[in-house]
Structures are given as C-alpha cells and as structure tokens.
Regions:
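Short glycine-enriched, charge-decorated loop/helix-capping segments at active-site entrances
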Residues: 5-12
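C-terminal target-recognition/interaction regions appended to catalytic cores
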Residues: 145-264
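Short catalytic/ligand-binding loop motif for oxyanion handling, primarily in non-cytosolic enzymes
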Residues: 1-3, 44-47, 78-81, 94-97, ...
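Conserved Class I SAM-dependent methyltransferase catalytic core
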Residues: 14-91
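Flexible, glycine-/basic-rich loop-and-beta segments that form/coincide
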Residues: 80-155, 159
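Short linear capping/connector segments at secondary-structure termini
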Residues: 6, 39-41, 263-264
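Residue-level signal for well-ordered alpha-helical scaffold segments within enzymatic catalytic domains
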Residues: 3, 20-23, 27, 248-251
C-alpha cells in the first residue's frame, strides 16, 4: 500500500499489488490460504482518516476470515526505529494460545485500538487480538554495528559537514556540541527533514544520540537518506550508513553476501 509521496493509499498505482493479490485470493475460493499476513507502515491506520484500514480489513471479514493486527517496532530486535503494522488473517478455528481477550499495550498501542474502535460493526465482529510472546531484550546499540575505520572515500567533505550543521536548530546543534566536547568516538544518526516554520518550508538536519538509527530507506524510497555524524577529539565528520552496516541493522550476519552495488 502506497503511503509515501501523494499518500494516495489504496487508490495509488503501486497499491494495485494488493488488489491484484486479493483478486487471486477470491478466485481460489475453497483453495484460498487459511492464513494470510500483510505488512505495511503504521500510517495505514490513519490513511484517509482510517478508511484504507477499514477497507482492507473488511475484505478479509467479508471473505470469512478472522483478522487482527499488531504494531511491531524493529527496535525490539535491532537498534533501528522501524515500526510496522502486521495484519494477520485466519480462516478456521483459532488456537486459544494465539489469541487474547483484550489488547496488549506492547503490540496494540492506542493508535491501533482507536482504529479498531472505528471499524464498522460487521468488520469489528471479525476482529481478533493476537497474542505474541515478548522478544528477548535487545543487547546491541547503533555504535556496536558501525565500522570505526571505514574507507576514506566514504566521508563527505568539510563543506558538506558544515552545511549540514547549519541546517540544525539550536536544540540539535547543542546535541552535537555536547558530543564534540567528549573526546571519545561517538556517532549520531542524522536525517534531513522538511519542517514548516513561520509558514515556510525549511530543510532541517535532525540528529539522535539515543543509540538508535532511524528507519532505513531503499534507494528508490521517498524519504531522506540516513547519514552518520561521527565525532572524535572535537572533530565532526559526516558519512552515509554503509551497506554492510545497513545489513547489520536489518538483522543480517556479516557472513551474508550482499549484492553488488549500493543497497542502503
């Protein structure tokens, strides 16, 4: 489902993948899969005032599926902030061990509960609260997955670094100054954002030092590419997240063979 760019949701051309998929499901009839899982960004809950979420769930309900959803953040497993909505539908008897009578705040936050409350009665009757085990506590932060001595050519120029710093608000610049005051190696994840300030669209660079990366994008994605601002001995240096680092953030071991070319 397309929620980037024009945010056309289920009506966007790229969302034809869902309708094409659903047409195949409907034609299967008794041969249709008993369990279906769909993944999308959390923004689906509010897309077109919740109508896209309702439409999608209604397709499952009308086809005789029980359906529920969970919001799961990759931060539970890896130092990357990447919240995704997982819609799980099942036709047939539901194992009691996989369902619960009420939402779980870990996987069913208020935004999801509010979207469920807004469902029409017929679709609401098909809703199920899925039960998930809690994952073990994450034991790595962003710094643990970064290369301390990357190839020299990946570093951006001093001018590019200063230009990015100039795009920061005082709050974010203070965070950088605090890192510069510490002689130890440190790295913060940086995104460029368009913010509305005094009715004008302004490009801002925003940095986080919480041991987390922001949501990684694909080369063809519509969001800002993530950068790293590395500080050591009072010097700031700027570079992108490397392909191998991105793979680590996605949970892949270093033994995984990356394809040729840029992948992050």
């Amino acid at each position: 489902l397309s929620l980037a760019g024009g945010r056309r949701g289920l009506n966007a051309p790229r969302s034809g993948a869902f309708w094409g998929f659903w047409n195949v499901i409907e034609k299967q009839r008794e041969r249709a899969p008993k369990t279906i899982v769909i993944e999308n960004v959390a923004g689906l809950l509010s897309s077109h005032n919740g109508r896209d979420f309702t439409t999608l769930l209604s397709q499952f309900a009308d086809a005789g599926y029980r359906v529920g959803a969970m919001l799961i953040d990759a931060a539970m497993f890896s130092p990357q902030s990447r919240q995704r909505l997982f819609i799980v539908a099942h036709k047939g008897k539901l194992p009691a061990s996989l369902t619960r009578d009420h939402p779980d705040a870990v996987f069913h936050p208020a935004t999801l509960c509010n979207a469920v409350d807004a469902l029409p009665d017929q679709t609401r009757m098909a809703w199920v609260w899925w039960r998930l085990p809690y994952p073990p506590r994450r034991n790595a932060d962003l710094a643990a997955l970064l290369d301390r001595n990357p190839p020299e050519h990946v570093w951006r120029s001093e001018d590019a670094t200063q230009k990015l710093l100039a795009q920061m608000t005082p709050l974010h610049r203070q965070r950088v100054e605090a890192a510069l005051a510490d002689p130890k190696w440190n790295a913060g994840a940086v995104f460029r954002r368009i913010r509305l300030e005094k009715n004008e669209r302004v490009q801002r660079a925003e940095i986080r030092y919480d041991g987390m990366a922001g949501c990684l994008r694909t080369p063809a994605g519509g969001s800002s590419k993530q950068l790293l601002l590395v500080t050591e001995h009072g010097r700031p240096r700027l570079r992108p997240v490397l392909a191998r680092e991105a793979a680590r953030l996605m949970g892949l071991e270093d033994s995984y063979r990356l394809p040729l070319g840029e992948t992050n």
